[in-house]
Each structure stands twice: as structure tokens, then as C-alpha cells.
Amino acid sequence: MIKQRTLKRIVQATGVGLHTGKKVTLTMRPAPANTGVIYRRTDLNPPVDFPADAKSVRDTMLCTCLVNEHDVRISTVEHLNAALAGLGIDNIIIEVNAPEVPIMDGSASPFVYLLLDAGIEELNSAKKFLRLKETVRVEDGDKWAELSPFNGFRLDFTIDFNHPAIDSSTQRYCLDFSADSFVRQISRARTFGFMRDIEYLQSRGLCLGGSFDCAIVVDDYRVLNEDGLRFEDEFVRHKMLDAIGDLFMCGHNIIGAFTAYKSGHALNNKLLQAVLAKQEAWEFVTFQDEAEMPLAFKAPSTVLAY
């Protein structure tokens, strides 16, 4: 059978919090089968757990948060969640000694390295996939996102930014998902923001960890980062990274096709909740052997050479 995945060992790293600008220690621990993805704040006494759950997601101006019934939150979970989706990690405990996951370089790549360094362990329990049976679509003005039946995981994302640094030919990206394609083509794409917005937020005591080290920063005319872009279409690739993380908030890799126009965290989450609420539109499936399973979800192989 195709088995659930966790880590082989504990792995730890430090980084900076996007909101506070302070050092954050991140510890990722193996977890038993059927635990799911659990974020944990150890700066609170007693520590507070936040299971990854579409209904717990709140989208703020700066990041995605998970919020519990007491309005306690953990922030900036989206890029780490994308790395978990990319490598198909089903069960993990993620501890931070702060109200937020460190922003690292603004992409999912540092988290991918950490997870691969810890190693991936298969558990003796069947991995459950969420497979689309019907198309579900959500809209917000001219923005929209949909999931439809497809034997694999295919993503097609279009952005529409009228900015000199973002050429019109680099505003759409399509991906046939696999662990390898995620690591090579998506995980390194960084988040982005306007210099004027960062300066304004920092003047109000917000976004204190925001810098050229953790984002693509643009002014009205150009990219300000000395090293430029990692991909000519890095902006849309990062929006796809966000979507992969947002959709994994259900705790399961999705078998289906995701298509979006100008979508963001809030609309991605609205789509996921709409799918989950329409029980006839999806089903959980398991696979007895690799031959039955879509190629998209084969265990990561060549990514270690990346």
C-alpha cells in the first residue's frame, strides 16, 4: 500500500519573524500515523496546538494565520505548509517559540532542505488522498479559482499585475505537480512586496522582519534586490507556491486540477472550504501499489540532488 509519511528525525533551525523581526527557533518532529500536520507555539504556557484545518485559516495583509477558538493565532505558516505538500509529509509536529513561523528567505526552499535533511519515513498506515469528483469554483469580482477532476495534480495560475518589472508574458504558469517539479520549479520562488508598503508598515511597528533577505522588493519601476529574480516569472511561481500550501490545509494531497485567475490566500481557502462542504464533489482514496497511483505523488527521488 502507499503509506503515510513523516520525518525520520527531529530537525531544528532559526530564522527571523516577519512581524516581530526577532529570532525564532523552529523545531520539526516526527509524528505517528493519522496525527496530521500540527503547528505548536511553545512560547505559551501551556503550549498551544494548531492542527492544519481549512476552517482555522485567517488571511491577513502580511501572511496566513491559523486561529483557534480562543483567538490565539500562529502566523506565517503558508510557505512551510507548501513544503509539506511538495514532499507529501502527512504527519508532523512543528514547534516555534514565537507567535510566527520564521520567514527564512521568503520561499519554501529552506523548509524543503530541512525536511530532506531530517529524512522522510514511511509509516505503516495507508496515505489518504482527496480526489475531486466534480468541479467546484469560487469567485470574487473578476478573481476566481476552481478545482476539477484530473488524475494527478495539475496547476494553472494567472496573475494580472500592471507593473514594469512584471512582463505580460511572465504572468501565467502551468505545472504538472510532483515532488521533483515542486522542488525545482516552485519552492525557490520568493514572496514579493512594494518598498513603500514595507516602509509604511515598519513605521507603524509592523513587518519588522521584512527585508531584501526575505522577499522580492519592487518600487514603481523595477526590482530593487541586488541579485534580481531567481526566475523571470518568479512572481506567478510564488503565487502557485502559496496555492499549493493553502490547498494542503485540508491535510491531504489533492488529486485534481487547480486553475486560478488573480487568486490569493483568501480565495484559495474559500475554494478549499467550498470543496470540503460539498461532500459529493470529492472522496478519500488510498492506493495498494504505486502502479495505481498518479505519477504526481511518487515518493521524492531526485530532489536530493537539487
Swiss-Prot record:
Assigned EC number: 3.5.1.108
Highest taxon in the source lineage: Bacteria
Residues at the catalytic site: H265
Species of origin: Yersinia pestis
Cofactor(s) for this UniProt protein: Zn(2+)
Gene (UniProt): lpxC
Name of the protein this chain belongs to: UDP-3-O-acyl-N-acetylglucosamine deacetylase
SUPFAM superfamilies noted in UniProt: Ribosomal protein S5 domain 2-like (SSF54211)
Keywords: Hydrolase, Lipid A biosynthesis, Lipid biosynthesis, Lipid metabolism, Metal-binding, Zinc
Cited function: Catalyzes the hydrolysis of UDP-3-O-myristoyl-N-acetylglucosamine to form UDP-3-O-myristoylglucosamine and acetate, the committed step in lipid A biosynthesis.
Binding residue positions for Zn(2+): H79, H238, D242
